[in-house]
Amino acid sequence: MYGDIVRIARAQIPPSVKFIVGRVADIETSPERQRVTISGGDVIDARLVVLATGQGDVLRQKLGIRRRMVFPKHTLSFGFPIHRGPGGARFPALTYYGEHPRDGIDYLTLLPLGDSLRANIFTFCDHRDRWARAFRDDPKRLLLEVMPGLAHFLPDFEVVGKVQLFMMDLSTVEDHVRDGTVLIGDAFQTSCPAAGTGVSRLLVDVDRLCKTYLPEWLATPGMGADKIARFYADPAKRAADARASRAAEFRRALTIETNLKWELRRREMYLRRRTLGWIAQRLRPLSDHGIGSVRK
């Protein structure tokens, strides 16, 4: 699925843009020109380097940019393909929310992937917990252990592939205003996968950089830190980053906190989903290929 998205995105690159595949071995920056050395020895000379390396630290460290941990091991996610089997409801997609705060499970999504379904589970479990450690070896049993109501929708499902595990730290960067280099997306600030803000944040970064700042920067000499600082101070970018941070805190608290405030918030969200689900079923029944959203 991810590979397909990448191929589609790369197909949009115009022929006038040179596309190079390689591993960056070194990077040197200055107020005027930047030099990127590929592992094979080729050198790319450019006015600006845009760093979109996700959680990778190697190039950031070469540039003297430090990562500041906000919340280590914030989210633990699992992904795997399943075959739905002959029974149960027929749906193109399903979101099933965790049943108890003690389980630490936010929600499960099921999306079509060829002849199978792609299951993604977003949790705030400790990776050392019994359930989390054992899940990769016996995913079906342990999934039904914490989501028994899922059997109503998928009574005969089978896990048909390897379970992938993803641990996400929440972090941001310091000392990042540097000559000739811009960090975007997770390279600047990571996002909670359960909150679903990573792509939207990245798109805001790209939109503001390409439409507002790059035309101005390239129209004048130099690429010093004073220019770069304007991008990081952009109000739209800062607002998107702040929304992502708040969403990460909200999803975790909504999932695992047990005090009265969050119990009431869970009930509110449950009633809202049930109401929207009822309306959706009246407009387009689930059995008629609607999209389901369930919390027991």
Per-range role (PLM):
Residues 31-33, 103-106, 169-171:
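Short beta-strand-initiation
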Residues 1-62, 68-74, 78:
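Conserved N-terminal helical subregion
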Residues 32-34, 115-116, 179-180:
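Beta-strand-connecting loop/turn residues
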Residues 211-296:
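C-terminal helical "tail/cap" subdomain of flavin- and related membrane-associated enzymes
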Residues 21, 28, 37, 43, ...:
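Well-ordered beta-strand positions
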Residues 91, 155-158, 244-249:
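Short coil/turn segments at secondary-structure boundaries
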Residues 127-219:
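FAD/FMN-dependent oxidoreductases across multiple families
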Residues 52-152:
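Conserved FAD-binding catalytic core of PHBH/FMO-like flavoproteins
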